[in-house]
From Swiss-Prot:
The gene is ydiU. It comes from the Bacteria. It catalyses: L-seryl-[protein] + ATP = 3-O-(5'-adenylyl)-L-seryl-[protein] + diphosphate; L-threonyl-[protein] + ATP = 3-O-(5'-adenylyl)-L-threonyl-[protein] + diphosphate; L-tyrosyl-[protein] + ATP = O-(5'-adenylyl)-L-tyrosyl-[protein] + diphosphate; L-histidyl-[protein] + UTP = N(tele)-(5'-uridylyl)-L-histidyl-[protein] + diphosphate. ATP binds at G90, G92, R93, K113, D125, G126, R176, R183, D262. Nucleotidyltransferase involved in the post-translational modification of proteins. It can catalyze the addition of adenosine monophosphate (AMP) or uridine monophosphate (UMP) to a protein, resulting in modifications known as AMPylation and UMPylation. This is Protein nucleotidyltransferase YdiU. Belongs to the SELO family. InterPro entries: SelO. Mg(2+) binds at N253, D262. Its EC number is 2.7.7.-, 2.7.7.108.
Length: 488
């Protein structure tokens, strides 16, 4: 396997004009140590776990040491935050070290989050804390295992360097990987400055690098915008189907590649609640779970607006017009598969009514769908393990009769259907209380075994893993008091 020093850097973004970024080196931290790592993410760089046994590697992932070929920069962008335009944001604590080209020819940008102050820190200290870094690490890799497009997390490195939030905490850095960290806000900043050429130049770069099939078009920009909208629709369908709530869907947190980007106060549904707000700071519920598809549509209008200098308003509007239908198709296809049904018009009422039952009875979303895999289509009034989840069992029985009839009409044997459904409905998700338990052990005892255990468990979310059965249970009562916010 390779070493960090042997990696081939091909820093495409850093070859753009400095209009798009500022060159800045990470600020060192004292006595860095390894908290956790992802073997799967390491392999994207042709590295294995032995590389993390080298002190030089930990120093590099702490931002204390730059390697030949690295070109450290912080990216400029703007964005709409909670619906209001903020003219300059940028990487306030993240520093892009460079882009590695692996043996498969894939480009992976390496970014350190929590690497210190940059010209875009806006008075912040440029640091991230251990708790938020562990959360981002665990969720990035868990989302990948759920087959949801996401940035990746290679490792978390900690330091006893104090960081002050509500209380004194300790610093940490997450090594993040992505083909690109370009966001909707990367274009918005130049639109609001009335600078057309930087918009065009950035669009040309993104198309050449990540949408090369569009290069042959006489006018690639409308199709580029259309493709971004379709990727965004697919991502929203995946979030909604798995019960993931991002928490801060500002336009600066929207990936131009349709990746899940910037894990902050996220949360997965426990009891099914369409209006679930995972971010304690979101007092108005703008980014509530059931609002996410519409927020993404609104964010796309802001991207379209930013690209209007490259096309007419009508063309930009047309380019994103397919989003509602694309989202609807993708969401129905995923939900139908989770219910073991074909995605037809007759499937919609069954799914909609089931979700209403879940909401009315405060039934755990993930547990219900996993138990649904074992539904006996021949026993209309049976299925006791599933039925026992509901307070209104008569309502469940009525729905179960309809569902059983639909399954029988579908004609697939129960055992075959159950096996397929178990590949669509995870048994294990990153519940907030599981992350909290791991973080407490890490912060209080410097014991990272629970972080490692959770990472290994969530790398196989669809498998039974009977030794970890307790991790699939409903959250305890104390977990309902956990609050997460943008503070990290």
């Amino acid at each position: 396997m390779a070493t960090l020093e042997s990696l081939t850097f091909d820093n495409g973004f850093a070859r753009l004009p400095e209009t798009y970024y500022a060159r800045v080196c990470p600020t060192p931290v004292p006595d860095p140590y390894l908290v956790c790592y992802s073997p799967e993410a390491l392999s994207l760089l042709d590295l294995d776990a032995t590389e993390l046994k080298r002190p030089e590697t930990i120093e590099t992932l702490a931002g204390n040491r730059l390697l030949p070929g690295m070109d450290a920069i912080a990216a400029l962008y703007a964005g709409h935050q909670f619906g209001h335009y903020v003219p300059q944001l940028g990487d306030g604590r993240a520093i892009l070290l460079g882009e590695v080209r692996n043996r498969a020819g894939e480009g992976w940008e390496i970014q350190l989050k929590g690497a210190g102050r940059t010209p875009y820190s806006r008075g912040g200290d440029g640091r991230a804390v251990l708790r938020s870094s562990i959360r981002e690490f665990l969720c990035s890799e868990a989302m990948h295992a759920l087959d949801i497009p996401t940035t990746r997390a290679l490792a978390v490195v900690g330091s006893d360097h104090p960081v002050y939030r509500e209380d004194e905490e300790t610093a940490a850095l997450v090594t993040r990987l992505a083909p690109s960290f370009v966001r909707f806000g990367s274009f918005e900043v130049f639109y609001y400055r009335n600078q057309v050429e930087p918009i065009r130049h950035l669009a040309d770069y993104v198309i050449a690098r990540y949408y090369p099939e569009l290069k042959t078009l006489a006018d690639p920009y409308p199709e580029f915008l259309r493709q971004v909208s379709l990727r965004t629709a697919e991502l929203m369908a995946q979030w909604q189907a798995v019960g993931f709530s991002h928490g801060v869907m500002n336009t600066d947190n929207m990936s131009i590649l349709g990746l899940t980007l910037d894990y902050g106060p996220f949360g997965f549904l426990d009891a099914f609640d369409p209006g679930f707000v995972c971010n304690h700071s979101d007092t108005g519920g703008r980014y509530a779970f059931d609002q996410q598809p519409d927020v993404a549509a609104w964010n796309l209008t802001k991207l379209a607006q930013a690209l209007v200098p490259l096309m007419s308003v009508e063309t930009a509007s047309q380019a994103i017009s397919e989003y509602p239908q694309a989202f609807g198709r993708a969401y129905l296809a995923r939900m139908a598969a989770k219910f073991g049904l074909a995605p037809g018009d007759d499937t919609v009422p069954l799914i909609t009514d089931a979700l209403q039952l879940l909401a009315g009875n405060r039934v755990d979303y993930t547990i219900f769908l996993r138990k649904l895999c074992a539904f006996d289509s021949q026993a209309d009034a049976g299925n006791a393990p599933l039925r026992d989840l509901f307070l209104d069992r008569a309502a469940f029985d009525a729905w179960a009769v309809r569902y059983g009839a639909a399954l029988r009409q579908h004609g697939q044997p129960d055992a075959e259907r159950a096996a397929t459904m178990r590949t669509r409905n995870p048994k294990y998700i990153l519940r907030n209380y599981l992350a909290e338990n791991a973080i407490r052990r890490a912060a209080d005892l410097r014991d990272y075994s629970e972080v490692e255990r959770l990472h290994r468990l969530l790398a196989r979310p669809f498998d039974e893993q009977p030794a970890f059965e307790a991790y699939a249970a409903e959250p305890p009562d104390w977990a309902k008091r956990i609050e997460v916010s943008c503070s990290s």
